Regions:
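A charged N-terminal "starter" segment
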Residues: 1-113, 119-135
Length: 136
């Protein structure tokens, strides 16, 4: 855990300005592992899908991926971040109300998951066209 003093914060402000993120990646990692392990005691098939919308800082997203977590994305940018840091498509879940039809098709063909908000959503029509993947 970080030991912050007012002097340390002042030094950081001198370097980065008054607005910056300070992340404790070790603490984030430990919290992720602890949460996952506790749930797996009760639900052995439990997985965490980390919301990139909440904080898509690649370092944090990579920690989630390195610990077996899933990427929950809501935009093309978040999808690209997930793929760029090495998340397997099978561990990407596209959620949210706005979905690019071409990106959905790409993710489905790669083995990813798309949450469907209604039976009328465009994903339903697209998935019917994809015959190579029986899990759609």
């Amino acid at each position: 855990m970080l030991n912050l003093t007012s002097e340390t914060i002042s030094e950081l402000c001198d370097v980065y300005g008054n607005a910056f993120y300070l992340l404790d990646s070790k603490k984030f990692n430990n919290n992720f592992v602890e949460l996952s392990n506790e749930f797996k005691k009760i639900y052995p098939n439990f997985n965490i899908a980390y919301s990139y919308k909440t904080n898509y800082t690649p370092k944090l997203c990579k920690i989630v991926n390195d610990n077996g977590g899933y990427a929950e994305v809501v935009s093309e940018m978040e999808l690209e971040i997930a793929l760029r840091i090495g998340v397997e498509a099978t561990k990407i879940i596209w959620n949210g109300p706005i979905k690019n039809q071409d990106k959905i098709k790409q993710l489905l063909l790669m083995g990813g998951t798309v949450n469907i908000d209604s039976v009328f959503e465009m994903v339903n029509n697209e998935s019917k066209k994809i015959t190579e993947n029986e899990n759609v």
